[in-house]
Swiss-Prot record:
SUPFAM superfamilies in the cross-refs: Radical SAM enzymes
Keyword DNA-binding applies: no
Gene field: miaB
Cofactor(s) in the UniProt record: [4Fe-4S] cluster
Binding locations of [4Fe-4S] cluster 1: C28, C64, C98
Subunit structure comment from the entry: Monomer.
NCBIfam families per the UniProt record, alphabetical: miaB-methiolase, MiaB/RimO family radical SAM methylthiotransferase
Name of the protein this chain belongs to: tRNA-2-methylthio-N(6)-dimethylallyladenosine synthase
Length: 463
């Protein structure tokens, strides 16, 4: 049980001008970007960041519901905070994100100590919602809405690499995925608003930006305008050309892509635009066509392989990463083996893996051919072993190469090393030389000779 001393309780009840907050983020990059914006809103309101959640006047959990283990963590955290609120009634408890959208008012009934439950579409309305809480209301904001253009300065976790949302929501209907029901329909931001945000990051000495979207290749489908060739006027490809020449930004990334919409025109743009990094995250989910059909993914393995071939024909050293699900309902041993074969055939740099987890309000959740937990565990262990082996083999190609590394900071586990990432998004540790003068700043790009490769990181020395 969380307890406070009398001194701590007195300190907690200090003047409201020194209110503090704590945000815990679960899940994807979109959630991380949302949390940065909510932190910016809170600081605009006069809150300061607490040193830990036990000292915060407001605690916010930005949640994920893509798998059930993420939900269990949230409820565990909420249980501890609910006990704390019984001792400190002025404590504000907020749940944001996908779990909040999924559960809505039922979450308020399950955890009555909560003050505010808000879905992802309401991130930019946090200040107004907290105003309602201050009037004594318990608030649930989960109705579908147009996402207002964010005018709040985000509190960025990095001073070098910035997230930039370009499209919200998802119109796909994958049979296993809860995202469309909790993130809403696709809503693209206008190019000029995106460019303005990136320009502000450049003015603040950011060097790298990552464009974000649940289905980023869908960017612009909902915006007006059609070219004389009959395609949409504003696409991800067009946006890359539009933002490429912003001075100060040296690296551009984007995620997450959908194979159904990954075009040759986009690949050509990535090849031509030297700021766009040679790293592509393109989930395949299964290596079997029948399972892909059951998943309602809208492509087959031949199409997926063609995309990878087209990328590597122009950028042979490009990093290819992906997502995969094992033990989908009805998946046979042979269909599972097809997934392992695809990983071996393509040679991914990394694959994020998960055993299938039934999610509320998705078609696959109610199918009768669910696989056992034992099968899920076995297949997940096997695929993870293969992914690690493949990643280790892929990273061997960097040995003795000279790679450009963007410095992000000191290695928190080894103060004699700095750390950063290559253009292909390989985490790289660099030993700080003792026998020569070496001055560096965050955001510098340095040439590093790679001398050690592990499955998910590299180590090297200054050239």
């Amino acid at each position: 049980m969380l307890t406070k001393t009398k001194k701590e309780e007195k300190e907690f009840q200090k003047d409201s001008t020194t209110r503090s907050y704590w945000i815990t983020t679960f899940g994807c990059q979109m959630n991380k970007a949302d949390s940065e914006r909510m932190a910016g809103t809170l600081e605009k309101m006069g809150y300061t960041r607490a040193d830990d959640e036990l000292n915060a006047d407001l605690v916010l959990y930005n949640t994920c519901t893509i798998r059930d283990n993420a939900e269990h963590k949230v409820y565990s955290f909420l249980g501890r905070q609910a006990k704390r609120k019984h001792k400190i009634p002025s404590l504000k408890l907020v749940v944001a994100g996908c779990l909040a959208q999924q559960e809505g008012e039922s979450l308020l009934r399950r955890v009555p100590e909560l003050d505010l439950v808000m879905g992802p579409q309401h991130v930019n309305n946090l200040e107004n919602l907290l105003g309602k809480v201050d009037l004594g209301n318990q608030v649930a904001a989960t109705e579908e809405t147009f996402i207002s253009e964010d005018i709040t300065n985000a509190r960025r976790e990095s001073s070098i690499c910035g997230w930039v949302n370009i499209i919200y929501g998802c119109n796909e209907r994958c049979s296993y995925c809860v995202v469309p029901s909790v993130r809403g329909k696709e809503q693209s931001r206008y190019p000029n608003a995106i460019k303005s945000e990136i320009q502000k990051l450049a003015d603040d000495n950011f060097k790298e930006i990552t464009l974000l979207g649940q289905n980023i290749d869908a960017y612009g489908r909902d915006l007006p305008g059609t070219t004389k060739e009959g395609r949409k006027e504003n696409t991800l490809t067009d946006l890359l050309y539009y933002i490429h020449d912003i001075n100060g930004i040296s690296r551009i990334r984007f995620a997450t892509s959908h194979p159904r919409y990954f075009s040759k025109r986009l690949i050509q743009a990535c090849y031509e635009l030297d700021k766009v990094c040679e790293h592509f995250h393109i989930p395949f989910q299964s290596g079997n066509d029948e399972i892909l059909k059951q998943m309602s993914r809208g492509y087959n393995i031949k199409k997926y392989k063609n995309i990878i071939d087209n990328i590597r024909s122009l950028m042979p050293d490009a990093s290819i990463t992906a997502d995969a699900i094992v033990a989908f309902p009805g998946e046979t041993e042979q269909q599972y083996q097809d997934t392992l074969k695809l990983i071996s055939d393509i040679g991914f740099d990394q694959v994020n893996t998960a055993a299938y987890s039934p999610r509320p309000n998705t078609p696959a959740a109610v199918w009768s051919n669910q696989l056992s937990e034992e099968v899920k565990k076995t297949r997940l262990q096997e695929i993870n072993a293969l992914v690690e082996k493949t990643a280790r083999n892929r990273n061997q190609r960097y040995i003795n190469n000279i790679e450009s590394v963007l410095i992000e900071g000191l290695n928190p586990k080894n103060s004699s090393q700095i750390m950063g990432r290559t253009r292909t998004n390989r985490l790289t540790f660099v030993k700080i030389p003792k026998n020569i003068q070496f001055n560096f700043s965050l955001g510098d790009e340095i040439d590093v000779r790679i001398n050690e490769a592990r499955p998910f990181s590299l180590t090297g020395e200054l050239c």
